[in-house]
């Protein structure tokens, strides 16, 4: 029991050392992975509280364990704040992640073998939108739609044709690598035409939706799933919004249908995050995300770099690395050497495998959290061009990156 009184540094210096290495990496690197962000001190603090000790199966006021009177209040706060943030009828804040949120909706409205329409992974979708390597693709009959090969944007007429042909029980809208505005009203019209439920996965754009920087799916979708990190800038976790008539069905699907005990320390951190997202400053933040993405877009286009769909309407850009005569994997490695973190990503009609790819995906949420604005975002894009076109020595670019990021410390 004496071990319980020791701090991390004293009890496990090995883990403590690796933790500090990661903190140093985050400080000295430019984080451009579109799904990553930096949480506030308040969110970080909440995740490390004694709430992690508490089991609380069930929902506020209806638990299977005693001693839940305080976590009930916290979880209800998270629910109420999330509903207010998106003007939603109902919210479930228990999903451990975005994938769990998606699967919970499937469990709620589908039976194994039911037909679902979802976006093709290689053209911007997500593993849980029916990829054959994911349980969604194994349990359900997913028919996939993609983007127009010329424009790189969703072909809504093709979506409609597929829906009319296959009569899906559920249509899934939303993406993990799509840089343009999604027309949720069109998806609703298609769903209504074939009598399907509509689920929107807004994990990537949730922060933008909350502030009006992207149209909201909430008025149109039966279910809306999201992560709570990414553009919401909260702890790693998931959440689901739904219409009032689906409330009981959804809650039963999350628990006991798909999950057991909720992570109340994470739910508390979600509550803190949602309070942050309701502040006026959060609107300024999401507006700046878009400004920074546009600033980077200009640099790439001015340097004859091909961007999928020709640019961006949101927080992310999808870069065709064949513009530099290399694969996405090679580009990711080149940028990593100069302390710029990205991820290789498939692009429409990609001739490479998912482990190699022809593209990289970048996003501006994390650098915007650190305080970078258009001038610095422009500089970051120029660093990328310099590295990928080998205009300057890698060590010189890396030094410039480290010096730039010293001006924008994390959580200071």
Swiss-Prot record:
Mind listing the UniProt keywords for this protein, alphabetically? Answer: Amino-acid biosynthesis, Cytoplasm, One-carbon metabolism, Pyridoxal phosphate, Transferase
Which residues pair up as cystines? none
Q: Which residues carry this modification: N6-(pyridoxal phosphate)lysine?
A: 230
Write down the InterPro entries for this protein, in alphabetical order: PyrdxlP-dep_Trfase, PyrdxlP-dep_Trfase_major, PyrdxlP-dep_Trfase_small, Ser_HO-MeTrfase, Ser_HO-MeTrfase-like, Ser_HO-MeTrfase_PLP_BS, SHMT-like_dom
On whether Cytoplasm is a keyword of this UniProt record, the answer is yes
Q: Where would you find this protein in the cell?
A: Cytoplasm
Q: What is its EC number?
A: 2.1.2.1
Which molecular-function annotations from GO does this UniProt entry contain? glycine hydroxymethyltransferase activity; pyridoxal phosphate binding
**Which GO BP annotation is one of this protein's?**
glycine biosynthetic process from serine
The family database entries (Pfam families) matched by this protein are listed as: SHMT (PF00464)
Q: Where is this site: Plays an important role in substrate specificity?
A: 229
Write out the pathway annotation from the protein's UniProt entry. One-carbon metabolism; tetrahydrofolate interconversion; Amino-acid biosynthesis; glycine biosynthesis; glycine from L-serine: step 1/1
Tell me what reaction this enzyme catalyses: (6R)-5,10-methylene-5,6,7,8-tetrahydrofolate + glycine + H2O = (6S)-5,6,7,8-tetrahydrofolate + L-serine
PROSITE patterns the record matches: SHMT
Q: Which family does it belong to?
A: Belongs to the SHMT family.
Role summary = Catalyzes the reversible interconversion of serine and glycine with tetrahydrofolate (THF) serving as the one-carbon carrier. This reaction serves as the major source of one-carbon groups required for the biosynthesis of purines, thymidylate, methionine, and other important biomolecules. Also exhibits THF-independent aldolase activity toward beta-hydroxyamino acids, producing glycine and aldehydes, via a retro-aldol mechanism.
Q: Which PANTHER family match?
A: SERINE HYDROXYMETHYLTRANSFERASE, SERINE HYDROXYMETHYLTRANSFERASE 1
- Please describe the quaternary structure of this protein: Homodimer.
* UniProt protein name: Serine hydroxymethyltransferase
Which organism is the protein's source?
Finegoldia magna (strain ATCC 29328 / DSM 20472 / WAL 2508) (Peptostreptococcus magnus)
